[in-house]
Amino acid sequence: MKDLLKFLKQQSKTEEFNGIKIGLASPDLIRSWSFGEVKKPETINYRTFKPEREGLFCARIFGPVKDYECLCGKYKRLKHRGVICEKCGVEVTQTKVRRERMGHIDLASPVAHIWFLKSLPSRIGLMLDMTLRDIERVLYFESFVVIEPGMTSLERGQMLTEENYLDALEEYGDEFEAKMGAEAVLELLRAIDLEKEIDMMREELPSINSETRRKKITKRLKLIEAFFQSGNKPEWMILKVLPVLPPDLRPLVPLDGGRFATSDLNDLYRRVINRNNRLKRLLDLAAPDIIVRNEKRMLQESVDALLDNGRRGRAITGSNKRPLKSLADMIKGKQGRFRQNLLGKRVDYSGRSVITVGPTLRLHQCGLPKKMALELFKPFIYGKLEGRGLATTIKAAKKMVEREVPEVWDVLDDVIREHPVMLNRAPTLHRLGIQAFEPVLIEGKAIQLHPLVCAAYNADFDGDQMAVHVPLTLEAQLEARSLMMSTNNILSPANGEPVITPSQDVVLGLYYTSRECVNGKGEGMAFESIDEVEKAYRTKVAAIHARIKVRVTETQIAENGERTESRRIVDTTVGRALLSRILPKGLSYDLVNQNMGKKQISKLLNTCYRQLGLKDTVIFADQLMYAGFHYATVSGASVGINDMVIPDEKYTLVADAEAEVLEIQEQFQSGLVTAGERYNKVIDIWASANEKVSKAMMANLSSETVINRDGEEEEQESFNSIYMMADSGARGSAAQIRQLAGMRGLMAKPDGSIIETPITANFREGLNVSQYFISTHGARKGLADTALKTANSGYLTRRLVDVAQDLVVIEEDCGTFEGLTMKPLIEGGDVVEPLRERVLGRVVAQDVLKPGTEEVLVPRNTLLDEAWCDIVEENSIDEMIVRSVISCDTDFGVCAACYGRDLARGHIINQGEAIGVVAAQSIGEPGTQLTMRTFHIGGAASRASAENNVQVKNLGTLKLHNAKYVTNSVGKLVIVSRSSELAIIDELGREKERYKVPYGTVLEKLEDDAVAAGEIIANWDPHTHPIVSEVAGSIKFVDMIEGVTMTRQTDELTGLSSIVVMEVGQRPSAGKEMRPAICLIGADGNDLMIPGTEVPAQYFLPGNAIVAQDDNAPINVGDALARIPQESSKTRDITGGLPRVADLFEARKPKEPAILAEHSGTISFGKETKGKRRLVITPADGGDHYEEMIPKWRNLNVFEGEKVERGEVIADGAEAAHDILRLRGIHKVANYIVNEVQDVYRLQGVKINDKHIEVIIRQMLRKCEITNAGDSEFLAGEQAEVSRVKIANRELEAQGKQPATFERELLGITKASLATESFISAASFQETTRVLTEAAVGGKSDKLRGLKENVIVGRLIPAGTGYSYHQKRNAETATGTDTEAAPVISASEAEQNLADLLNLAGSSD
């Protein structure tokens, strides 16, 4: 019978579709969907359990309850298919039509749809240009609204209270019409002529001056245009007919004990039907107005509750005081349709179990318990058993498997061979959380996992569980084997480094083997080959750490694959010689001839992958692991309490620190330092004491003195187990050893502040009660943090994935010449990240020239691999322009050249790769390692921030960047520009260090001078801000009147007097308008000019400036005319960790943002107002000047008369990304966000490639604001997708019309996700109601471009292996041919086929 049904299945086929459109349903459309009107609130008959007629489960409307059987039982069986029973009116067909047939309710009075009423901004309100409150008062029958004023003085849409209405009736009689309720709103909406409104508003727009009014009209215009273009009619926002959901989607399930469980929707529908029927009866009876009104209001409320319960007023609750789940609740939220059933489904053929170690497995294998395998591969086993003739029927096969006869196991072995399974560990934070393995059958019940893949899964064996999934189809097996096999995922997609690096015991074993010791057994022997070494080791002639000489044979592999062998003698140890046996051919012996810590091993694997490729690396990684386990066992490393050696110096160091603290305490009590300073200093003292103790401890641990062969004492690296574990990177760190053998150190309170009494004891000595309490205090905070962090990190990842999910590589090369300028990252003089690491795997955007010549070193469009990077480094190139996804020109995707290398594969990225998701996972996955805390900058850092000089670390030459300077009387340079930087260049022209130097810095060296390491080359006063003279002459005071604009103050200690300019607020009224200044005059008494300009040398003095010179005093170039004291910058918290990353990606505005210059020009200060000063910038080309009000308390970086460039910092603070984009452009904002995000991750030692952050930034920059519409169909001030505007502009330019101009906009990731073109994707992310309301009103069509939309509608995603399928479809839709659908048979053909089959079956009896 099952086979027969196949013929009938083809009746209802899903049409191929290319998009999904959402719109408003008209009453006629709703009626056309419906199969009948639901008139009664009954559900099923309580005795017969049959559905009531015309009720909510009526079989006549919705279809039969049993397959091919009418309700009264007159027609049963297949042969009556399609007949409608004359007794009960039920069509004989399959039950599943009850999942798709809808009904309807004819409403006795129209009802407003709550989504279009209450979802802000209210669409109905915007359409009618009325406030939401007014409309609600009409809808809920509190006031009348005028619909047709006629010849009266009333206006259309005017609100009338009951009294007003009665007065108007008396006055005008029936000349006017006013109504209440949804009917009134319906008539108002129906009366709107969309086209006329649009024309009126478009004419009105240009003449409007008020900003708010323009915004309001633009909003309304957009809405009306959306209606007009989509063909929706405004009156459809009011329901006249209510559709009824098919009954099987709101089932009534019998529980045991005769009770029923029902879906909340049934209650809600029942309520609507009851009220509707009562209203019909009242209308028939012509009941009094007030009763009818009340009933209509109740109907409106019950429909509201059905559509979106709790949106207005209190939510309707069921019998158990729980709000009922309405239609809107069904689709939104984590438990809603989108996230629960469409994006995350449960799958069949899966199992889960605890994992244990499989140290004997190969990298591509996993151990699968026989029991699990038998269950998972059942259908395959049945098939095999039947195929081999061991079982006659499936039923027999089933019996065999249940009895577990021996043949079954042989078959299972066969089935499993070369059939990969997928292992997944939750939480799956990145794509390496699911990998494929070949199963190996094992006894027991735990899955065995290869130790090297633990890092990718972040798994350990303390009870973690993993899930197994079986890829069933051939295609799935192929993908699992070729793409997801653990051996194909050696490199991490986040940073391109090996992710299958050994850890813990393996590292310890390899490290132990490769160490050397003085005077080991067999030291100084020389061996002819590695085989001999092994023999000596096995026969115990030579110890594993002994230093020996040995002849090694190395294979070099040339570019073309030719192999040459060479031999040489190396100094090494027995252990390293043994390790080199597993080294693949083609790698140098030097790679193992060193202490093999975790970093070295990782580098070794990386080199192996780059030089020899995947296969050798996989084999090598396995061998390394086996060797590591073996030698770790041999080493017998263990930890005893005596391994934690406490340094003798500890006690004196602690005593010294305590004495210092006492001294500060005394200073505090005598009032010399403030409480804050005392606290900071105390913490500093303890922090440095802690450092010293741990230094002494590590020095003590790390070396030991032994007797060498000559009988003399010699220092050697210690073989202390704890030290070895930390040094090799196997487990633990100096910070942890410090707590065991040094001192526990400072602890933090739960709020993050540091407790000033540290724990001076360590764990070996033991803690006393108060120390123990403080310890637990901090530890508990750590646990609470971790729990919060996980949730926050997961949410960040979800937002990132959502914003980037539809970004896919869709073409080879977009041909752009744009790119980002890459320089080495230098912080405080150290190169944090050399240029090589930043450009590796990128494509060059413009030819790189050899320094000092015109010769092209790296041609454009070269993919920089390791070899090219070597060339770049040799030629000491310190900046280059590389392609980036941010500047990629491809529409709706990116090109391979702008992305560069696929980090996980090491070649240029393939088309169809979902780079957006990879980027989001790479940024989100380490999120759990980031801290949650904001860092309190305590003493140490605040002291560092008040630096006052630059001390060089390397030899080199001095170079200045964007610096203006003058030479003072003693021949030193004085910097007179802001944001100047000073760099040190080595002899090859590479930049080694770079420092920011403030205005007024005095340089000890001239530009291009040689500097030595450790020299101090620049000084400045961190506490005051000088005003430097740029010419020599005499001082002339302007507007400097004692007691009016300035005062004289005498210093008590030195007796010197100085002039202090008064703040505007303190001056008498005569001085309010005066502008105190210093003017420089020459010997002839005329004003001097600033060199090279026509600007007189006049320096305006702000309030509180201190002038050291007197009137008419001579002055030299570079001397300070005045000093402005700087308030000591308050120690402010810097947000760090996860919250900082989230803030950057959400593009949040900082609390006190830096103020940037909006234009280039000259600064002057206009009239001051209360609490604010007016900053005026006059452009050099004489354009309109720009004014801005700035609060007085902001510290300004600029003086009157100074020139600024657009985007320069005027007042310090955190820079807002929006400002950087507006004033400095897209590349600068990209650099800013990339560097800021990287700073957070770098602090935690996490490496992420810049590319991933750039991908997210590209998505944040997707939208733009139209500044001038030109001849396009956009509106000025409208937000649009950049790709759309570019495409439109290309068309306009081709026609010779004026294109639209636009300004890029930066959106935070949440906003950007909600602003995508695809409403399905946005609705499944957040704010489902709002997204769907907006989409419906605009009649939006979702083209199913992204990944998420396709997952939701159940198709292959347009990325990876599904990419070509989508390419083919798109090409066909473009040319107009249809993809071949499944063969469709008409019902009559199917019936014929069936009859034939039945005859055959019948004749074979």
Curated annotation (Swiss-Prot):
Chemical reaction(s) catalysed: RNA(n) + a ribonucleoside 5'-triphosphate = RNA(n+1) + diphosphate
Record keyword Transferase present: yes
Binding site for Mg(2+): 460, 462, 464
Binding site for Zn(2+) 1: 70, 72, 85, 88
Cofactor dependency: Mg(2+); Zn(2+)
InterPro entries for this protein: DNA-dir_RpoC_beta_prime, DNA-dir_RpoC_beta_prime_bact, RNA_pol_asu, RNA_pol_N, RNA_pol_Rpb1_1, RNA_pol_Rpb1_3, RNA_pol_Rpb1_3_sf, RNA_pol_Rpb1_4
Broad enzyme group: transferase
Keywords: DNA-directed RNA polymerase, Magnesium, Metal-binding, Nucleotidyltransferase, Transcription, Transferase, Zinc
Gene Ontology terms for molecular function: DNA binding; DNA-directed RNA polymerase activity; magnesium ion binding; zinc ion binding
Keyword Nucleotidyltransferase attributed: yes
Residues binding Zn(2+) 2: 814, 888, 895, 898
Cofactor binding annotation: Binds 1 Mg(2+) ion per subunit.
EC number: 2.7.7.6
Any Pfam family the entry gives: RNA_pol_Rpb1_3
Gene Ontology biological-process annotations: DNA-templated transcription
Any single GO CC term annotated in Swiss-Prot or TrEMBL for this entry: DNA-directed RNA polymerase complex
Subunit structure: The RNAP catalytic core consists of 2 alpha, 1 beta, 1 beta' and 1 omega subunit. When a sigma factor is associated with the core the holoenzyme is formed, which can initiate transcription.
HAMAP family: RNApol_bact_RpoC
Family: Belongs to the RNA polymerase beta' chain family.
Free-text function comment from the UniProt entry: DNA-dependent RNA polymerase catalyzes the transcription of DNA into RNA using the four ribonucleoside triphosphates as substrates.
PANTHER family: DNA-DIRECTED RNA POLYMERASE, DNA-DIRECTED RNA POLYMERASE SUBUNIT BETA
Protein name as annotated: DNA-directed RNA polymerase subunit beta'
Chain's gene name: rpoC
